[in-house]
Every structure is written in C-alpha cells, then in structure tokens.
C-alpha cells in the first residue's frame, strides 16, 4: 500500500477494538465475469517440447475441437483458440525433449497483463501452480510439488467450471482452486479506542463520493479531528 496511507493508519491506533454497525449502505458490487473466457495458449517454458492430442471441449454445448500438433525448440508459445463458455476442458499430451523446465497453459487471457496460467514444472521445475494475473499483478491460486522429466509423456487436462479450476496430470488431480471475483463494499470501516480517544477509520475505494453519518453511542460533546487522504487513479 501507499506509504502515506500506511503512515496515517499506523499513527491512529487504539488499544481496544470497538463494535461497529452500519445501516443504509448499498449492497456490495461483484466485479468481473462469472466465467473465465479468453485465449488458450500453450508454451514450452525454457525447454524444447512436443504437444499433441490437443483438444478443447465446450462441456456446456458438447462441442469438441481438435488441433494440430506443436513442436518448439528452446522455448516457444502458440495460441490454440479462444473460448467463451462457463464450462470447458482443455486436454493435451506434452513431452519435454530437452531443457530444464516444463510447460505452461494460458487460459482466460485477454492480454499479456490479464490471464490465468497453469505452470507444469514451474519455478526451477519444482511445482504445478495455477497463477492469476490482473493488470500485471500476479497471485498464486494453488501450488503443489511436481517436476517434469525429459522424454516422458504427460497427459494434461484443465477443467474450468464457472470460476472453479481443476488441473489433472496423468489422470490425477494436480490443482483445485477458485479464481474468486472481487467484491467491493460501499465503505470499509473500523473503530478503536484508547484512554483518551476514539479512532474511526473509513475507506472508500469506489470512484464516487459517499455521504455518511457517524453516531458514537454513550459519548457527548465530541471534539473531532479529521484527516482525509485521497489520490489519483492507479490507471
């Protein structure tokens, strides 16, 4: 978080957390889509690799599409297709022929900064990981230990149902996770106290102003100091 926000909040801390109730606020806003749609891409990650038996199944409609084999020397990536469905499956067989890492499957990709990726033999060829990027900022959704061996075939499968993600390696579940949609409250708030003061903190992360009334029960004749911090959009 921004330095000035942290400084302001750390200078205004109480010893006791107070009960806070709200009334009259709008319902939280759920952001984004309830499905993961976009480009599907396959990559040989710091290795030479072959990909075949590539198939995408739209489980919602029953439509099945197959694709040509792929082969990369010393890395490479290809767009397989784009899908807009709430339930689908991506299947392929992968084999590393040289190199020291593994494979990556990109899905739900709208651009290079907004996507989800499945690493098979990621981070020094030591894991199977599902990672989501939003505006270039990455988050690990699920991680397990796994290594890719040269010359060995791996039957890989990704299933996406709504925002539920499950990956399989050779028929066994490798990752299971949910890429949850952000939920934005109208106002975030807390209150605390010490021997002399009551501290009320409120944060509005929306792009519109909010007018609210603060009622402090059991306290008369309040003298208040208000500190307000605002800034420009991060975009």
Task: State each model region's role.
Residues 27-183:
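Extracellular glycan-recognition regions
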Residues 165-167, 214, 224-226:
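Short beta-strand elements bearing conserved aromatic residues within extracellular beta-rich modules
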Residues 1, 207-210, 233-235:
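Flexible loop/turn segments at secondary-structure boundaries
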Residues 16-19, 113-119, 231-235:
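Acidic Ser/Thr/Pro-rich low-complexity disordered segments
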Residues 1-30, 181-187:
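Aromatic/acidic polysaccharide-binding cleft in carbohydrate-active enzymes
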Residues 6, 200, 226:
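Hydrophobic, well-ordered secondary-structure elements that form the walls
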Residues 185-220:
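Carbohydrate-binding surface patches
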Residues 220-235:
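Acidic, Ser/Thr/Pro-rich beta/coil linker or hinge segments at domain junctions
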């Amino acid at each position: 978080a921004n330095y000035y926000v942290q400084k302001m909040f750390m200078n205004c801390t109480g010893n006791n957390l107070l009960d806070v109730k709200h009334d009259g606020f709008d319902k939280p806003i759920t952001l984004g889509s309830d499905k993961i749609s976009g480009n599907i891409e396959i990559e040989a990650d710091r290795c030479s690799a072959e990909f075949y038996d590539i198939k995408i199944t739209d489980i919602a409609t029953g439509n099945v599409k197959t694709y040509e084999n792929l082969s990369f020397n010393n890395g490479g990536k290809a767009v397989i297709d784009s899908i807009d469905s709430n339930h689908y499956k991506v299947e392929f067989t992968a084999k590393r022929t040289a190199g020291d890492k593994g494979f990556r499957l990109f899905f739900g990709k709208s651009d290079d900064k907004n996507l989800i990726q499945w690493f098979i033999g990621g981070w020094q060829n030591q894991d199977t990981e599902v990672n989501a990027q939003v505006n270039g900022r990455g988050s690990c959704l699920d991680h397990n230990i796994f290594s890719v061996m040269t010359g060995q075939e791996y039957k890989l499968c990704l299933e996406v149902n709504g925002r539920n993600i499950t990956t399989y390696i050779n028929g066994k579940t490798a990752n299971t996770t949910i890429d949850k949609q952000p939920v934005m409250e109208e106002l975030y708030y807390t209150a605390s106290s010490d021997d002399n003061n009551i501290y009320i903190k409120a944060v509005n992360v929306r792009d519109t102003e909010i007018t609210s009334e603060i009622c402090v029960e059991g306290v008369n004749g309040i003298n208040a100091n208000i500190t307000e911090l605002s800034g420009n959009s991060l975009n």
